[in-house]
């Protein structure tokens, strides 16, 4: 029984009468009724006296009341000064009427009745409340009256506590004394609360008594085992109907062989769908009884039961004896299964035939069987071996065997001399099958030589690698799947290679020849054939050498030669050549004529021999190279163009066919040299230098002669050698010195070579005169002469130089030069009319005969003109613009000068006639002077006279206040003084303004103005303890000037003392405790915020209690009367409330030695209490003491007598409840049990390092994982609070809060990554990231959250500023429809700027589980390469499954990123869970290479000290251990033994790998080519279930509509009915109606996800096959005509017709099935859901009956037991919102924990149990691991149903209600048990859930097929074969199936489905005389056992 307490308050206000006029008081009486578990019979009253004259010593009050039960006692008198503001009354009786009287007495009045009232106290609640549950809808409530006090009635409230019954709220009032009430119309399984109240005199009890109870839940529906293997049964059942309320199911199995024979399964979904449970660890082949019950709280329903059997173990190691393989027979061998398994025999068959054989079970370890008389040589057969236990077969063990092919025929060879190759041809035996041919050849003559082998698939082959000149043996074999036929052989010979002539030389009367041969060619000898030109004489010489000399030939004659190689009597191709013999030389050569540059030569012909022409050549003595002239036939030649001055040698020779005589004829001669020309004269006053180009030809020296023209007798001579004439070899230079200035001379020049002189060259040069005059400017310094220059000079003496005149020039083309005679006595020259300011270049010469002397040069500049006007065009506060007129003449610039405010001269230069003077002081007068300047300082500079003017600047804003500081600071106000220098006034000051801002609260700001003459001011109303920024500005008429800033923290003083009546009040008391109440508003924040409170307790309040250091409870224990003491350390209680109730005396201080302790009070003792408030550590103020409060007397012995038994009972109940919950939730995490964080250990007592030796790690893992990972849970719990006490100050700043993705994932201050601040912007250095240690560095990683869209620029800044070269991303951008991370990188290769950082994708590589991308980062001119590692299959809060996937990813990462490349940026969504797991695994994988131990706990501990919640969940913590265990055990890349899928043509040769628990971990290998893989969209939906064994280092990317999916090239995906195929993930947001085109040459299918929009009807696969999709009934009706199927792919349509659980009832996901086009029953059926109560088929009219066969002859009653089996990979479920988010691989697939598989009409796939945190703290708690991972391997269904077809005209009948699933949907309650041995058993081979859909009440249509889909039905008589027709939907009771004529008459199999009965296959089975069974399954054997893997 539980008491719920409440509080009620009644306040009555009374006004006192006018007995004492000077006292008018307003009194109020407040009644506070409080009930506790200890004492509920008391009521407390407070008489409030607001204006009590407490200083009147004579005044008092007397309180009287009846009945006399309460405290104070009746007629108690209390002095007025002792009361304070109120009188406390307590201990009133419950359910009682009280009368109160209050009397007042003072000096003038005695017992004056001031107030009276009658009050009824509230009654106690009822007692002994109980509930009797009668059924699921009825219950009786019973109770007893209260133990004390009166009552008149009772109120009963019934409240629904369950979610479904929360609206149930009924209230009943019971006025009689029956003390019970009946409640009806309750919900079965619901939980309710009963609340009982007592009513007395219209008042309810303030407390109530309550009790919870639960009604019985309804019994669950029927169930099936829809998946099983050798050790596992997966049970699927329907919920109760009506469902009612229940929390979970209890599922049990007998015999109890399972690991857990009793399972508890939680209910999922609302309304609840079918549920499931898995029993593992069963014995293969054994029968088991299974029961299912519903549970709600402690209530349990009646059971539903059935019996099923497990699958036996399969055979092992199917092999073939190669010695027994012939062209028509073979032997197969196999081993018995290992382990315990029950089976009777073996079944052996060949997949392509219908022949099956059985082999009895024996004790031999190896069994065998011989297949004979197979007339198909070379063909490959798939042999299937199974164990059979009863009617159940095991999974198949298969092997491929190929028969030996027949030998080839007609083998021939042909040599091709043109290409030097050999072609061989042959014929294949038409009776044999082969896929290639093997060619083997070797050389016969070579011992131990190499044998070459080639293969081809054609019957013709060209051999190009045979060596020339060899004899070979060659054989050909036919090969089929590496099985060879017998050999067929021949011999072949090759021709030798042609020799190549290396050297052929002419000799006297003969030829010398040599050659070389191919090193690979063999030859026996060589033959040389030669003949003379023009004759038929052919001669032959043979030799074994590679050279030959031929003699006695005709001189000058030509010969043709051929060389052959000979081998095995075969000649090679010849090598031919033509060569002539040396001719005889000419005779009698002479020189006939020598001219200036030519020579005529003559000679005589030779005496004998042949020749064709004469060759002529010549050269000089200094040259080696001959110059050859054209050949001639005459006996003379004219040689021209010879070089002058050279000596030549000339040769003449005879020539025959290009071969010259070895002895030529020669002669020598010399040519005269050339004279000089083009002489250049270089003349000065004393020298003449002559320079001419070197003449053509040879010159040895030059001869020069010269003399004065007027004196020929003075001749001088000079001889100049050619080698000394000049440095330049192309010219000749000669200097003639010591000549007279101004004189003319004559020169003669000749050349000489080999003693021969050339002609004479003459010339007449003159020397330059001298000038020795001194020239000056006479007026150069006169400023007023601005247009005239006068020159003055001295004469040059005639004795030193001959000249005629003087010449003067100013260098101006407009001014003519002036000349004066040499003997002129006037020595001045004047130039007038010049330009002012211009610079003139003055030049003076002497001239003799037109030759001028060197010049004398001077410079002079005239003064410029000054300006005449100066005025200002614009004036501002700091600038004046000036303008003036332009002067005449030339000038360079203007010089503007003025005095600054500091009296410094400032000068400005400008070339324009205007200027703007800046940086002036406002409100100042300035004088400006302008001077015109011509020239520069580096040349001649002239300045004009100046012109001045004065101007004044405008006003401006004032300057910065110079001095600004406080003179007095108080908690809430501050006094300032300031000053502004006059130089900074910048005008007339109008005012000063002070603005202030609280830096911690920007809204706390203001501004105050002061007069211009004020220099002091005060700012008020500030907040104590806050820091303010004060800014002062001066103001002129223009505006405010710049700010001067001062920062001040306001002081904090003790709080103001509150009023005397403000004291703590009593709330409750006991014998050792007092509970007081005080409020936040007791103290004002005027002197600073009150930060802490403490309690002062005084028994003797007269003692001093105002000191800072107060005695503690321990200090006063030695006093009989306790001194005032402090009860607790200061604390702050007003975080979320304004009232605090504090209990004094609650602690046990026996072990408390130091500090304050809230020890117990003394019983029956009066205390006073006051509250102390602190604004600082030493700043405090106390309230006045409270009214006296007396503790109760001690009743401890009574309490102990009651409490101890109750405590023992409570402990037992808690223990029992804990044991029960742990049993029910054996795999639950301890999340709920950890709700109280106070149970966690502090960091100081946690052992931070826990190293484990690597050699002991496997045993350590076994111990930790025992008992449902209990020790892992304990160890992980110790990490819960590690590091959580560290500050996150910066992350919580207002400017940084929007940058955090989650409000409780904040970076610690000490380890956060700090960005470079931007422009002093607050928070610009913040990003949610921390440094985390790695194996190689304490700052190896930067862990951050997934970037938000608003923080991705900061993210790239962090990558750049940290110089990181790698990013590891462990999340997808969207998961379950929620954003986990912004896509912070470009979509394509186009560069994108993120802030000032440009990011461009260089390349990317796609793998099955991750993507690696290279980015180019650019910032300014700097570039970097960064790698991005994106793991794409990690579920949020989950772990990759298998864990080896994560190990391979870490390995791939570390292979590319070295230890020195750090830091590494790592992020997931929050940056804690997955990121921590990755880093831990990276560290331990490196640690095990260098150490003999690992410390996973220590690594996680260290990371949590740097960033919050690293490795967030226990599941992730365990995953790290699992990864390491896999690495240490060598299972990093090994994922378990191979298993095989269903034996079916669509599964030929396919295998799947399972782990030791039977979980799927690898792919199904099938007939799938690499080309098929490239076209498949093979990305797995969930990495925990994806059956893909991939090669991490071989990426393959296939594209679909612009979106990439990934598939490893070495992977064969599961084939759903064909040889290939695979999963496909619709990968784009807008692909809700898209179809992934998936090609397969073995009839694989395409996977489609479509919603209910009309656009998704029928789609085409890549071969044109139809793809039917999930669609509504309306769409199904609109799509009766399907498009043509060109590729043979047949895929199912699923539609809904408002059935029990149709698409309208689904809420989380949709179903997609994979199907096959042939070879199983399901391929002739489609899936259409029907109404369970509708008697018509889906496509037939309602009148057609309920599920009949469509053919005649099926009248006889029959029973069919149907099994369905399908593999995990055959069914894939995607969420309905999958079209909006791509790549949600972790959302759904079967093996998630809470939801395994959802079938459209009864099984719903729930969420995978993972939390998806987004903006809420509770989402980030540990993952709830209630989910049970039931299975990872294949799914199958075994349903035994029995059917009795009633006789009717339609050939079919109703289906009996014994069908298990039908019963659960509304049929009878009869269980579906194992069939009888005599029953006909039909095994349906299915690879999707379509067959299961049929069992749930669906009807079936004939699957569309092509002409190749043939099903053969066999009877005892004749049989016929009917092809499945395209679109053969038949109206009628069922659907048109296969209609055949049976053996002997009238057996047929109808395609109908029993609709109302929920039938599966309308097998009309009939017989006639001799008629037998018709097998509906093309794979069924003679015993009715289908090859289904069951």
Curated annotation (Swiss-Prot):
It is found in: Membrane. InterPro entries: FN3_dom (IPR003961), FN3_sf (IPR036116), Ig-like_fold (IPR013783), Prot-tyrosine_phosphatase-like (IPR029021), PTP_cat (IPR000242), PTPRJ_TM (IPR041201), RTP_Phos/Ushers (IPR050713), Tyr_Pase_AS (IPR016130). Keywords: Developmental protein, Differentiation, Glycoprotein, Hydrolase, Membrane, Neurogenesis, Protein phosphatase, Repeat, Signal, Transmembrane, Transmembrane helix. Its main location: membrane. SUPFAM superfamilies: (Phosphotyrosine protein) phosphatases II (SSF52799), Fibronectin type III (SSF49265). GO terms for molecular function: protein tyrosine phosphatase activity; transmembrane receptor protein tyrosine phosphatase activity. Residues 125-218, 219-314, 407-498, 499-584, 585-674, 675-771, 775-865, 866-956, 957-1057 form the Fibronectin type-III domain. Residues 1829-1841 have a biased composition (Basic and acidic residues). Residues 1684-1693 have a biased composition (Polar residues). Residues 1673-1683, 1732-1745 have a biased composition (Low complexity). Substrate binds at residues 1436, 1468-1474, 1512. Belongs to the protein-tyrosine phosphatase family. Receptor class subfamily. May have a role in axon outgrowth and guidance. This is Tyrosine-protein phosphatase 10D. The gene is Ptp10D.
């Amino acid at each position: 029984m539980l008491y719920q307490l409440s509080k009620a308050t009644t306040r009555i206000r009374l006004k006192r009468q006018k007995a004492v006029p000077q006292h008018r008081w307003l009194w109020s009486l407040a009644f506070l009724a409080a009930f506790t578990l200890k004492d509920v019979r008391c009521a407390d009253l407070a008489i409030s006296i607001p204006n009590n004259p407490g200083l009147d010593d004579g005044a008092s009050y007397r309180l009287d009341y009846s009945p006399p039960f309460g405290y104070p006692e009746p007629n108690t008198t209390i002095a007025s000064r002792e009361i304070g503001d109120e009188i406390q009354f307590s201990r009133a009786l419950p359910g009682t009427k009280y009368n109160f009287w209050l009397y007042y007495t003072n000096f003038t009045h005695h017992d004056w009745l001031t107030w009276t009232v009658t009050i009824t106290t509230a009654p106690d609640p009822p007692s002994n409340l109980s509930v009797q549950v009668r059924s699921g809808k009825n219950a009786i409530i019973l109770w007893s009256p209260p133990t004390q006090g009166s009552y008149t009635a009772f109120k009963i409230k019934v409240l629904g506590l369950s979610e479904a019954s929360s609206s149930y709220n009924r209230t009943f009032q019971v006025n009689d004394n029956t003390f019970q009430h009946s409640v009806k119309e309750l919900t079965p399984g619901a939980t309710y609360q009963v609340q009982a109240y007592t009513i007395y005199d219209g008042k309810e009890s303030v407390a109530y008594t309550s009790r919870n109870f639960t009604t019985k839940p309804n019994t669950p529906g029927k169930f099936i085992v829809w998946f099983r293997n050798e050790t596992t049964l997966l049970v699927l059942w329907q919920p109760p109907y009506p469902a009612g309320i229940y929390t979970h199911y209890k599922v049990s199995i007998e015999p109890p062989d399972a690991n857990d024979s009793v399972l508890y399964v939680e209910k999922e979904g609302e309304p609840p769908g079918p549920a499931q449970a898995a029993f593992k660890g069963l014995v293969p082949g054994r029968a088991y009884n299974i029961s299912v019950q519903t549970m709600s709280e402690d209530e349990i329903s009646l059971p539903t039961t059935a019996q099923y059997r497990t699958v036996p173990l399969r055979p092992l190691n199917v092999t073939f004896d190669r010695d027994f393989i012939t062209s028509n027979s073979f032997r197969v061998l196999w081993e018995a299964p290992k382990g315990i398994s029950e089976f009777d025999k073996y079944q052996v068959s060949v997949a392509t035939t219908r022949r099956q054989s059985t082999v009895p079970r024996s004790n031999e370890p190896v069994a065998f069987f011989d297949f004979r008389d197979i007339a198909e040589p070379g063909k490959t057969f798939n042999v299937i071996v199974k164990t059979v236990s009863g009617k159940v077969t095991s999974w198949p063990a298969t092997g491929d065997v190929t028969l030996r092919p027949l030998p080839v025929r007609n083998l021939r060879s042909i040599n091709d001399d043109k290409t030097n190759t050999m072609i061989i041809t042959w014929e294949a035996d038409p009776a044999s099958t082969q896929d290639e041919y093997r060619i083997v050849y070797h050389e016969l003559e070579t011992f131990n030589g190499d044998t070459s082998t080639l293969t081809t698939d054609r019957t013709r082959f060209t051999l190009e690698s045979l060596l020339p000149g060899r004899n070979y043996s060659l054989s050909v074999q036919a090969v089929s799947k590496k099985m060879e036929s017998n050999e067929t052989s021949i011999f072949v010979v090759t021709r030798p290679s042609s020799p190549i002539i290396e050297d052929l030389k002419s000799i006297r009367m003969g030829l010398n020849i040599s050659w070389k041969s191919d090193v690979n060619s063999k030859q026996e000898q060589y033959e040389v054939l030669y003949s003379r030109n023009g004759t038929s004489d052919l001669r032959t010489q043979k030799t074994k050498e590679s050279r030959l000399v031929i003699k006695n030939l005709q001189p000058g004659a030509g010969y043709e030669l051929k060389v052959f190689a000979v081998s095995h009597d075969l000649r090679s191709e010849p090598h031919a050549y033509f060569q002539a013999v040396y001719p005889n030389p000419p005779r009698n050569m002479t020189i006939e004529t020598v001219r200036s540059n030519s020579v005529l030569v003559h000679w005589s012909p030779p005496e004998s021999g042949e020749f064709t022409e004469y060759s002529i050549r010549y050269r000089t003595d200094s040259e080696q190279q001959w110059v050859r002239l054209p050949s001639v036939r005459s006996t003379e030649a004219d040689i021209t163009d010879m070089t002058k001055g050279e000596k030549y040698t000339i040769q003449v020779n005879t020539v025959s066919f290009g071969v010259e005589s070895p002895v030529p004829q020669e002669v020598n001669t010399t040519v005269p040299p050339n004279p000089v020309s083009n002489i250049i004269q270089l003349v000065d006053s004393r020298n003449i230098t002559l320079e001419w180009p070197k003449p053509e030809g040879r010159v040895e020296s030059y001869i020069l002669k010269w003399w004065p023209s007027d004196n020929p007798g003075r001749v001088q001579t000079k001889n100049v050698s050619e080698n000394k004439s000049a440095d330049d070899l192309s010219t000749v230079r000669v200097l003639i010195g010591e000549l007279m200035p101004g004189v003319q001379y004559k020169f003669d020049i000749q050349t000489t070579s080999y003693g021969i002189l050339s002609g004479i060259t003459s010339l007449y040069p003159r020397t330059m005169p001298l000038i020795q005059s001194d020239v000056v400017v006479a007026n150069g310094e006169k400023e007023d002469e601005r247009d005239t220059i006068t020159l003055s000079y001295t004469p040059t003496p005639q004795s030193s130089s001959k000249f005629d005149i003087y010449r003067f020039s100013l260098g101006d083309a407009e001014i003519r030069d002036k000349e004066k005679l040499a003997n002129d006595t006037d020595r001045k020259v004047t130039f007038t009319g010049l330009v002012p300011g211009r610079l003139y270049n003055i030049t003076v010469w002497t001239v003799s005969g037109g030759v001028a002397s060197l010049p004398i040069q001077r410079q002079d500049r005239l003064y410029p003109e000054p300006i005449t006007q100066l005025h200002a065009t614009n004036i501002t506060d700091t600038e004046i613009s000036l303008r003036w007129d332009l002067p005449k003449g030339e000038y360079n610039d203007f010089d503007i000068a003025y005095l600054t405010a500091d009296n410094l001269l400032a000068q400005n230069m400008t070339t324009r006639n205007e200027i703007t003077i800046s940086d002036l002081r406002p409100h100042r007068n300035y004088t400006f002077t302008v001077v015109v300047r011509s020239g520069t300082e580096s040349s001649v500079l002239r300045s004009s006279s100046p012109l001045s003017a004065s101007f004044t600047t405008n006003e401006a804003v004032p300057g910065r206040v110079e001095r600004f500081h406080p003179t007095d600071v108080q908690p809430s106000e501050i006094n300032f003084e300031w000053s502004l220098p006059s130089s900074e006034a910048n005008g007339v000051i109008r005012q000063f303004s002070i603005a202030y801002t609280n830096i911690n609260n920007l809204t706390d700001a203001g501004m105050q103005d002061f007069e211009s003459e004020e220099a002091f001011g005060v700012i008020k109303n500030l907040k104590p303890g806050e820091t303010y920024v004060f800014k002062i500005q001066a103001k002129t008429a223009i505006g405010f000037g710049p700010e001067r800033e001062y920062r001040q923290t306001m002081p904090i003083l003790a709080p103001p003392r509150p009023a005397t009546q403000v004291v703590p009040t009593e709330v409750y008391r006991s014998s050792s405790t007092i509970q007081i109440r005080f409020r936040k508003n007791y103290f004002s924040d005027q002197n600073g915020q009150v930060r802490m409170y403490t309690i002062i307790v005084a028994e003797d309040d007269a003692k001093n209690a105002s000191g800072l250091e107060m005695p503690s409870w321990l200090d006063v224990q030695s006093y009989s009367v306790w001194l005032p003491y402090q009860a607790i350390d200061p604390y702050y209680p007003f975080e979320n409330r304004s009232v605090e109730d504090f209990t004094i005396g609650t602690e046990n201080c026996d072990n408390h030695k130091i500090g304050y302790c809230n020890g117990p009070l003394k019983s029956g003792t009066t205390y006073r209490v006051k509250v102390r408030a602190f604004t600082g550590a030493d700043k405090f103020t106390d309230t006045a003491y409270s009214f006296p409060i007396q503790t109760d007397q001690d009743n401890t012995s009574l309490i102990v007598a009651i409490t101890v038994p109750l405590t023992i009972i409570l402990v037992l109940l808690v223990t029992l409840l804990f044991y029960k919950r742990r049993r029910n939730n054996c795999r639950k995490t301890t999340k709920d049990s950890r709700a109280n964080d106070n149970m966690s250990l502090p960091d100081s007592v946690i052992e931070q390092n826990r190293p484990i030796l690597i050699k002991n790690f496997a045993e350590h893992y076994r111990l930790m994982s025992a008992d449902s990972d209990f020790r892992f849970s304990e160890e992980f719990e110790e990490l819960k609070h590690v590091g959580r006490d560290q500050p996150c100050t910066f992350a919580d700043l207002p400017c940084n809060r929007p940058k955090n993705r989650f409000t409780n994932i904040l970076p610690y201050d000490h380890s956060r990554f700090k960005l470079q601040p931007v422009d002093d912007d607050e928070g610009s250095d913040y990003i949610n990231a921390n440094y985390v240690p790695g194996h190689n560095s304490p700052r190896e990683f930067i862990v951050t959250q997934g970037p938000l869209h608003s923080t991705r620029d900061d993210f790239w800044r962090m990558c750049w500023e940290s110089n990181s070269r790698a990013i590891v991303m462990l999340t997808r951008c969207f998961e379950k429809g929620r954003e986990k991370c912004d896509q912070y990188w470009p979509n394509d290769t186009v560069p994108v700027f993120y802030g000032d950082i440009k990011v461009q994708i260089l390349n990317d590589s796609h793998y099955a589980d991750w993507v690696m991308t290279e980015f180019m980062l650019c910032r300014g001119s700097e570039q970097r390469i960064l790698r991005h590692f994106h793991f794409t299959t990690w579920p949020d809060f989950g772990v990759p499954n298998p864990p080896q996937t994560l190990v391979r990813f870490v390995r791939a990462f570390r292979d590319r990123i070295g230890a020195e490349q750090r830091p590494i940026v790592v992020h997931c969504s929050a940056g804690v869970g997955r990121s921590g797991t990755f880093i831990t695994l990276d560290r331990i994988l490196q640690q095990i290479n260098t150490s003999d131990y690992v410390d996973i706990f220590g690594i996680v501990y260290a990371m949590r000290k740097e960033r919050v919640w690293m490795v967030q969940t226990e599941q992730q913590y365990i995953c790290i251990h699992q990864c390491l265990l896999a690495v240490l055990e060598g299972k990093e890349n090994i994922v378990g033994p191979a298993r095989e899928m269903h034996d079916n043509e669509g599964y030929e040769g396919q295998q799947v790998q399972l782990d030791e628990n039977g979980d799927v971990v690898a792919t199904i290998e099938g007939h799938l080519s690499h080309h098929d893989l490239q076209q498949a969209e093979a990305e797995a939906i969930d990495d925990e279930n994806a059956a893909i064994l991939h090669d991490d280092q071989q990426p393959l990317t296939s594209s679909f509509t612009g979106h990439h999916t990934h598939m490893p090239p070495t992977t064969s995906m599961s084939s759903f009915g064909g040889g290939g195929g695979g999963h496909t993930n619709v990968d784009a947001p807008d692909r809700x109606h898209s179809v992934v085109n998936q090609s397969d040459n073995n009839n694989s299918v395409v996977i489609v996800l479509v919603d209910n929009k009309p656009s998704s009807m029928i789609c085409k696969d890549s071969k044109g096959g139809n793809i039917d999709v999930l669609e509504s009934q309306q769409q199904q009706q609109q799509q009766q005509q399907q498009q043509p199927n060109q590729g043979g792919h047949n895929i199912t349509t699923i539609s809904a017709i408002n059935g029990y659980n149709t698409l309208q009832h689904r809420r989380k996901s949709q179903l997609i099935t994979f199907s096959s086009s042939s070879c199983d029953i399901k391929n002739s059926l489609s899936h259409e859901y029907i109404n369970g109560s509708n008697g018509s088929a889906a496509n037939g009219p309602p009148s057609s009956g309920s599920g009949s066969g469509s053919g005649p002859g099926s009248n006889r009653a029959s029973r069919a037991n149907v099994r369905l089996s399908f593999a995990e990979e055959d069914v894939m479920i995607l969420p309905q919102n999958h079209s909006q988010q791509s790549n949600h691989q972790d959302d759904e697939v079967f093996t998630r924990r809470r939801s395994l598989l959802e079938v459209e009409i009864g099984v719903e796939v729930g969420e995978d149990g993972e939390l998806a945190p987004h903006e809420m703290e509770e989402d980030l708690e540990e993952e709830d691991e209630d989910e049970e991972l039931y299975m990872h391997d294949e799914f199958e269904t075994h349903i035994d149903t029995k059917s009795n077809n009633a006789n009717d005209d339609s050939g079919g009948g109703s289906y009996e209600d014994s069908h298990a699933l039908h019963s659960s949907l509304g049929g009878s309650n009869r269980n579906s048990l194992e069939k009888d041995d005599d029953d006909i058993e039909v095994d349906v081979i299915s690879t999707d859930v379509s067959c299961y859909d049929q069992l749930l009440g669906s009807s079936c249509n004939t699957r569309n097929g092509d002409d190749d889909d043939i099903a053969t039905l066999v009877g005892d008589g004749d049989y016929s074969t009917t092809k499945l027709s395209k679109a053969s939907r038949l109206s009628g009771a069922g659907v048109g199936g296969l209609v055949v004529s049976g053996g002997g008459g009238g057996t047929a199999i109808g395609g109908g489905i029993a609709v109302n009965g929920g039938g599966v296959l309308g097998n009309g089975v009939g017989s006639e005389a001799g008629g037998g069974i018709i097998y509906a399954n093309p794979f069924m054997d003679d015993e009715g056992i289908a090859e289904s893997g069951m």
